[in-house]
């Protein structure tokens, strides 16, 4: 009798649990159906994605089931949502593949699509770019440039699509291996842009004459034959582009491994710019005739070749570098930052630390540049030759309120080294525990001028072998 009651109790418990499980399953299925209710489904309704787009109208949703779709797609000006079954599930994204098979761009927005044209939750691969003739300023003149643009995605003609939660990988083009944006304003967010190649500029992303928003993307392991392994920016649209909250790492290029910026003034904030390698100039940033705002970024462990391990500022550029961490970068000259050729940046409240170079471990300033350097922590930088903290030549920087500490040069100028017609204005700086063969704090070479207050309001302590060495 007891056994029978026990069996009955177990049966009732099992039945209740089964009912609960079925209820939860039905609820989950109901929620999933609700998400895609009224959607066009591929391959159920149409065998290809492009056929579904052709049949869609503004406001429609197209849901694509996992699979490899070997095709190129064009939104044709339609403000529709194209999505996988679950853009938040990385496994679904990896298994829902649009593959161009090495022909043209994978995805095209070229007909004035708005922000309501959305692509989300796909792996986009196998693109080789569209042949386009676009205009660029070259040597002061607008010229038509035929090229293969936008291996993975191409955005043209004042289009403003939303590109989110995709993996864009293994695409190639002459410009914009992963994404090419020209005269448009897309929102590009939460994507992984990886292993793309540009033989020219913009291995990951190329923005030209555009007002794009790039946020929270992983841009990694892309390559450019010339400039902008991660991101290349040329010109700008109605408003500056915004680059915020991205991780830009392990990219490679001749110049500007992470960023190459030409005649543009984007706002670049809250990014991680880490472990990028330039064969020539600018492991992290290469700026040419540009004045971007670069704020609150982590610019670390980049390699700059001859110049500018972290940031290379060239040719009349006047950026604002504010509140950044510039740490552990390496170059032949200007391990952390190089400022050259008539440039006038505002460099303030940054941590410039643990950078290495032959000349100018922390900063190198030269060729008639006039930077304002205020409130920075310039510490523990190393120079194999001169100017562990800062190397200055033929320029007129103003340094105010900086802490220049614990830098070491194997030769001269532990804190600052000045050379060849440099005129250096110093006020309210702290020079502490810097080391060199001569000029522990400051080395002033023949022909250089040091302008100090009367009395000198800089602070010197513990510099070896001396504070100021004047030739």
Task: List PLM regions with ranges.
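N-terminal extracellular ligand-recognition/capping segment immediately after the signal peptide
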Residues: 44-50, 61-81, 85-87, 96
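Bacterial N-terminal signal peptides
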Residues: 14-25
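Right-handed parallel beta-helix
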Residues: 118-226, 232, 236-241, 250-251
């Amino acid at each position: 009798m007891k056994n029978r009651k026990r069996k009955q109790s177990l049966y009732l418990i099992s039945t209740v649990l089964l009912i609960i499980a079925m209820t939860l399953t039905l609820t989950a299925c109901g929620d999933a159906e609700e998400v895609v209710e009224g959607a066009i489904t591929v391959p159920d309704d149409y065998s290809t994605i492009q056929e579904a787009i052709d049949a869609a109208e503004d406001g429609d949703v197209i849901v694509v089931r996992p699979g490899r779709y070997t095709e190129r797609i064009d939104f044709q000006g339609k403000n529709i949502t194209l999505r996988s079954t679950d853009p938040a599930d990385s496994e679904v994204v990896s298994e829902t593949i649009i593959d161009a098979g090495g022909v043209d761009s994978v995805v095209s927005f070229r007909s004035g699509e708005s922000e309501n044209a959305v692509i989300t939750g796909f792996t986009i691969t196998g693109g080789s770019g569209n042949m386009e003739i676009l205009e660029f300023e070259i040597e002061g003149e607008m010229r038509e440039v035929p090229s293969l643009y936008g291996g993975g995605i191409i955005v043209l003609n004042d289009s403003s699509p939303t590109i989110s939660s995709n993996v864009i990988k293994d695409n190639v083009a002459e410009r914009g291996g992963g994404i090419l944006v020209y005269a448009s304003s897309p929102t590009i967010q939460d994507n992984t842009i990886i292993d793309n190649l540009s033989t020219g500029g913009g291995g990951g992303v190329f923005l030209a004459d555009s007002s794009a928003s790039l946020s929270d993307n992983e841009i990694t392991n892309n390559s450019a034959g010339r400039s902008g392994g991660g991101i290349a920016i040329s010109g700008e649209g109605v408003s500056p582009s915004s680059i915020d909250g991205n991780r830009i790492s392990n990219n490679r290029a001749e110049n500007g491994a992470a960023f190459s910026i030409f005649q543009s003034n984007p706002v670049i904030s809250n990014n991680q710019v880490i472990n990028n390698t330039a064969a020539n100039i600018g492991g992290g940033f290469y700026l040419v005739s540009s004045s971007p705002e670069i704020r609150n970024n982590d610019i670390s462990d980049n390699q700059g070749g001859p110049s500018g391990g972290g940031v290379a500022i060239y040719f009349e550029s006047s950026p604002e570098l504010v509140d950044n961490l510039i740490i552990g970068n390496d170059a032949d000259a200007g391990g952390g930052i190089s400022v050259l050729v008539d440039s006038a940046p505002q460099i303030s409240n940054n941590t410039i630390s643990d950078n290495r170079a032959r000349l100018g471990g922390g900063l190198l300033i030269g060729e008639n540049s006039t930077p304002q350097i205020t409130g920075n922590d310039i510490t523990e930088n190393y120079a194999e030759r001169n100017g562990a903290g800062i190397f200055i030549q033929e320029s007129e920087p103003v340094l105010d309120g900086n802490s220049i500490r614990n830098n070491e040069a194997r030769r001269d100028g532990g804190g600052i080294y000045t050379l060849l017609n440099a005129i250096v204005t110093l006020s309210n700086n702290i020079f502490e525990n810097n080391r060199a063969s001569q000029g522990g704090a400051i080395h002033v070479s023949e022909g250089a001028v040091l302008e100090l207050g009367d009395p000198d309001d800089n602070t010197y302590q513990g510099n070896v072998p001396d504070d100021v060495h004047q030739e």
